[in-house]
Each structure stands twice: as C-alpha cells, then as structure tokens.
Amino acid sequence: MSDSPQNPGPSSLKIYFRLLGYVKPYIGMFLLSIVGFLIFASTQPMLAGILKYFVDGLSNPDAALFPNVQWPWLRDLHLVYAVPLLIILIAAWQGLGSFLGNFFLAKVSLGLVHDLRVALFNKLLVLPNRYFDTHSSGHLISRITFNVTMVTGAATDAIKVVIREGLTVVFLFLYLLWMNWKLTLVMLAILPVIAVMVTTASRKFRKQSKKIQVAMGDVTHVASETIQGYRVVRSFGGEAYEEKRFLDASQSNTDKQLRMTKTGAVYTPMLQLVIYVAMAILMFLVLWLRGDASAGDLVAYITAAGLLPKPIRQLSEVSSTVQRGVAGAESIFEQLDEAAEEDQGTVEKERVSGRLEVRNLSFRYPGTDKQVLDDISFIAEPGQMIALVGRSGSGKSTLANLVPRFYQHNDGKILLDGVEVEDYRLRNLRRHIALVTQQVTLFNDSVANNIAYGDLAGAPREEIERAAKAANAKEFIDNLPQGFDTEVGENGVLLSGGQRQRLAIARALLKDAPLLILDEATSALDTESERHIQAALDEVMKGRTTLVIAHRLSTIEKADLILVMDQGQIVERGSHAELLAQNGHYARLHAMGLDEQAPAPVG
C-alpha cells in the first residue's frame, strides 16, 4: 500500500513551506502574532538589564537611573523607585506580547488545520475508486484525525516556539554583543555543533514519525473493521483473534512512539551539556577577564547568558514536533495531490431515453495484467431489462461499475443514448443512473433524509412518502417512533436488512433516473421481506432500462435479455426458455441454485 514509509519523498523544508503556504488567508493575524512575539522576546534582555541597576542600586539606592538626561522628572528618578516600576512595566509589556502572539497564532493554526481537514475530506469525495481499492479506510480516516493532529503541533506549538524562542535568542545575543562582543563570540563557537546535532536528530525524528503514522493507521483500521463487523466477530467467536490483532497493532504503535521518545530523551540532554559547557567556559572568562566592568554589568551579562539555554533547548526540541508535522503533512499532501476522477466530458442532457449500448468492451484493473472483461457487447433499448448471470468473479459487478464510470475502461465503448459515457460531464452522467446495491448504505440521519439524499435533498415530503409507498416501505416507516423523522443509526443499524433494502429502492424511485443498475441482494430474508422487496423491485424497474445482476429466478424470467458471463466473457445470451433449451452454462447455473420459486405477490 502507498501508506508505506519507505519512499523518501520531498525534503522536510519543502513540505513545511508548503504547509505554511496555507497561512496566506490568515496573513494579517499571522503578522500580529509575530509582533506579539517580538514584544515578548524584547523583554528578555530587559529583565537581564534591570538586574544591572538592581545590583548597582544595592550600594547606592538613591542614584539616578538616567543622570545625564535633560528632563528633570526623569533625571531625578532614583533606582529605589525606578527598578520596581520598570519590573512592573516590563511584565505588562511581556503580557501584552504573550497575548497577541499566542491568541492570533492559535487562530491562524486552528484555521490552517480546519482548512487541511476540509480539503482532505473534499478530496476523498472526488478520488477515483481505485484509490479506495488500494488504501484502507483506517489509514484514510487516520489522516483526517491523527495526521492532521500532528500537523496541528507543527503549525501551532512549533511555529510559536520557533518565532518566540528564536526572537528571544536573537535579542539576547544582540544584548550580549552590545555588552561584550569578544566574550559573546566564544559562545557562537558552539553553533556548528548544535547545527549538526539538530540536523541528525531531525532525520531520525522524521523517519520515526512516518512509521508512527503508518502504525496509527493500522490501529484505526483494525478498530474500524472490528466495530463495523462486530456481529460477525461475535457470531464466529472472533473476539480473541481481534484482541490479538488490535494488541499487536497498538503495541507496534507504542514501540515506535517509545523509540521516538528515546531519541528525544538522549538528544536533549546532550544538547544541554554542550550549551552548559559553553556557559562554563564563558563564566571562567568573565571572572578571569573582569576588567573595569561593574558588578551590575557582570550580573547582567551572566544573567542574559543564563537565559539562553532555555530557548535554545526549546528550539532544539521543536525539531521532533516539526518532523511529526512534516510526516503528517507529507501523507496529507500525497492525498491532496492525487488526481481526481477524470471528468473531461462536455455533454449535458436534461434527460436521456435510457438506450444503453456496450460495444467490444474490455477491461483490466490498474496494475494488473488479468483481463476482467473481454470483448463484451450488447444493446439495451429504453425500458428493457438486461439480466447478468454468472458465477462469482465472472465480471458482472465490474461491468455494472463501468457504466457510471466508477472505473475507466481500457478498450471498447459504452454509449448512453448514442453518446460515449466519457463524453458526458461526470455529474450529469450519474444523474441519469440510479444504483441499488447488495450492500445498502444508509447514513446516521432521518429516514426522510436517507431517501432524499444528495441531489434529492429538499424534495417535497409528499414525493418522499410516495417513493416510500411505491417501495413498500411506508408501512414500516409509519410504525417507527417518529415516522419519516426517525434516526436510523449508523448505516441503518436500527433497521432490518429488508427494511434497509426497501429504503435504498425508495431512494432510487425518488431519483427517477432512466437507467437503473441493480445488484440483487443474495442474503436470505424472511418470506414477508422477500415479497415486499420483490414487489418494490418490480415497481422500480417499470419503464426504466435496467441492468440487473440477478440472483432471483423471478427477476431473471422477466428479463428481456439474459447475458451469461464466465471469466469476463459473455458465453450465452437469450431468454430464460432459450437458454434452458441450450443445456449449457445457464442450465447448469439454474440447476445449482436459480430454481427457487418466486415469492407470492404482495396484496
């Protein structure tokens, strides 16, 4: 799968700059936050400087703060009053900077994460089917949740630390250079060592972050599968197996998290040691080369130098946060850069008659050599029903998926009303097609909203009720606690299988599309549900061109044309009676299980 971390991909810097490109809509707030952090950082050397006046004031508290200025009120300001007042003013100035920086950067960062999350979800809506075939739902969900959270760290904490602590280091270095540039140059000698350590650690952090990202996707995937299939898990006694599967996935994630923590736990103390060695050398030189500096000057210089390790350490630690964010952003951008479904058609029709022609159609799935469909040809005139019959894996579902362009076929043509399906605008093409599949998809919403879904949203309640009645669903809907406004639960969990299928048929009836693609359910239902569903299917197929993957004999007998498929080819075609008379593939399939009696009609 493409979730694998092996691909080195683009550089961290390139990815991070692309991530920061999402800041453009918030540039005003971003600049305000930088102003705030500038204010905050400027207070650090001020605090060191105020100690100079405090120490000097110990021996002469009545000394003037600014003895050489011309304004009397400032010239007469004594240290005993000035130092406490300045500390309060510096604290207020620092508080203002902290508020501006933190608040506005949080707005920028949360907006950025929101934009990324929405962009990811919107991209999922237009990605081709093959993308979902090669990416597990767990990993896709993990990108929207966990990976975006990693980006949040890079876009909030990391930027805040880089700007605030970076500016603090700059201001403190400028202050130290101003006080004694020779001594300060000694400290600069450690910068190459720090740079090498940060670069080495960054590579490790990014590599480990990618592995964590994949491991977290595995955790989400296992949990998602187990939750969705909890009935199968319980009925087949799969609890122990799923426990072990989740335990292994979670343990793998924990181990990778610990390895990353270990890297940080080793790296940070080593960096601190380097910084404090430089500080020790600096203090030795200060004491040895004291010169004519006052005690206040020395205290201020040592204090400013002592304030440096904390922001430098925080800057070094931010590397792991940034690399986690870069790893998350890389997978996010991989999805955002994926090409959407091909939609280069220009034809739009208000309504089609429903004439479907498949001409010399061949298809194989991307990345495989096996021909799934081979030279398929047939014509369905408006209102006709074509039944596809064959063993599992014969290509029936693939053929049905090619008509609404869920996949792009390799050779041949599919024409709707004489126009190739590729020439239609994708949205317009699918507007003419109603789809009823075996696996009914319902959303955690009301019954009415599940029937009037998507383009059908906003349909009058009378039309929704009419569609439900035609699908033999209105009776059970009226018996629900809140009727059409009853919530059906996730994927219709509060409804029976037969009820879910009737809602799907009602949805197709409300759409009133000229072309119906129907994959009959193979699941065994009670006789009452079977009768209701068969009656609903008869209603939904009236007057529509229908391509049905048929499992019921009653459906097959009504077909205008039966296509018998085997290994991607049409091996027989004709009516039910004609095919039985041939005593070939269809006759054998009929003998194996297509001979059940049609349910009795409703009413």
From Swiss-Prot:
Q: Which GO terms describe its cellular component?
A: plasma membrane
Under the heading InterPro entries, the entry gives:
AAA+_ATPase (IPR003593), ABC1_TM_dom (IPR011527), ABC1_TM_sf (IPR036640), ABC_transporter-like_ATP-bd (IPR003439), ABC_transporter-like_CS (IPR017871), ABC_transpr_lipidA (IPR011917), P-loop_NTPase (IPR027417), Type_1_exporter (IPR039421)
Q: EC annotation? A: 7.5.2.6
| Entries under Pfam families matching the protein | ABC_membrane, ABC_tran
> Which residue numbers delimit the ABC transmembrane type-1 domain?
31-324
Which residue ranges traverse the bilayer?
20-40, 79-99, 170-190, 269-289
> What's an example GO BP annotation here?
lipid A biosynthetic process
Its subunit composition reads: Homodimer.
Q: What does this protein do?
A: Involved in lipopolysaccharide (LPS) biosynthesis. Translocates lipid A-core from the inner to the outer leaflet of the inner membrane. Transmembrane domains (TMD) form a pore in the inner membrane and the ATP-binding domain (NBD) is responsible for energy generation.
Record protein name field: ATP-dependent lipid A-core flippase
